Regions:
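Acidic catalytic motifs of isoprenoid enzymes
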Residues: 1-166, 170-186, 197-243, 251-264, ...
Length: 291
């Protein structure tokens, strides 16, 4: 359910691309420093966006350094270090990845996910005193989501997606006590709903073939159509829902006093979401794509 929130590279200035990579690599290094080597494999672009957005709400000066890493052992990469927003994003990166593994185990008894979750569990408690209340919020929201998915009958896609949307709204608005917290919440809420729905559409064929829960199939496929037939009937509906969510994200973003990185953030919310949506709706395989 992660990795959909990325810049549109075609519309990105070179300096903005380098800044995005510096946050991404900084997040990777922070995960290693705060949680260990293993959790670094969970890094995703969505949490990079979170770090950039939250760091852009304050006029603090970033510290840039050049370091080697396991992926790029020869050439040093520019990273942002000692950054409060990145530390916050690192925690949620690890925590959400852990609960995603638990969901995989619950869904299909995945042995791989079961083993990985046991290894990852000890890491999410490394900063438990600092982030204890956030762990409870993640746990409660995702448990509510799983209950709603199991009892999907007579529920709308809005009702089911609410739990994940509320969680992402909580994550964005709970960083600090800004006077524009409400806009942060609704930006996060609509982004979470967008992620939940686009992920469901991306996985629709696989989930239908494996007879797994998929909110789009379970809510809308009343006539039990096969994938090809059903996709043709539902595509415009999903397009409409995703465009509305993306529009609400941008509207709330425009109400927030962004101090820096505005061009990069605007690129992600204006062009990146629409590009990703277009590719997923066309059936492009995004699994191995990277920036």
């Amino acid at each position: 359910m992660f990795g959909y929130v990325t810049p549109c590279k075609m519309e990105l200035k070179i300096k903005e691309y380098e800044k995005f990579r510096a946050y991404y690599c900084g997040l990777c290094k922070t995960i290693k420093r705060d949680y260990g080597e293993l959790p670094r494999v969970t890094i995703n672009y969505d949490m990079t966006f979170l770090a950039i957005l939250l760091d852009s709400l304050e006029n603090n000066k970033n510290i840039f350094v050049k370091e080697h890493c396991i992926v790029h052992p020869v050439k040093k990469k520019v990273i942002i270090t000692n950054n409060e927003a990145i530390k916050y994003a690192a925690f949620f990166n690890v925590a959400l990845s852990y609960y995603k593994l638990l969901d995989n185990v619950e869904d299909d008894g995945s042995i791989k996910s079961n083993i990985s979750s046991k290894f990852l569990k000890k890491y999410i408690h490394k900063n438990k005193n600092l982030y204890k209340k956030h762990i409870h919020s993640v746990d409660n929201s995702l448990k509510s989501l799983y209950v709603s998915e199991k009892n999907y009958k007579d529920k709308s896609i809005d009702e089911i997606s609410h739990h994940f949307a509320h969680l992402t709204g909580y994550i964005l608005s709970s960083y600090k006590d800004f006077n524009f917290k409400e806009n942060l919440y609704w930006l996060g809420y609509n982004l979470g709903k967008w992620i939940y729905i686009i992920d469901a559409f991306d996985d629709l064929e696989k989930d239908m073939n494996q007879k797994k829960f998929n909110v789009i199939n379970n809510v809308y496929n009343k006539n039990n159509l096969n994938y090809k037939e059903f996709k043709g009937t539902i595509k415009d509906k999903i397009d409409f829902l995703l465009v509305n969510c993306a529009s609400a994200c941008l509207n709330n973003f425009n109400a927030i006093p962004i101090v820096k990185n505005k061009g990069l953030l605007y690129n992600i919310l204006q062009f990146g979401l629409m590009e990703k949506m277009e590719r997923v709706l066309k059936g492009v395989n995004l699994e191995n794509e990277s920036l």
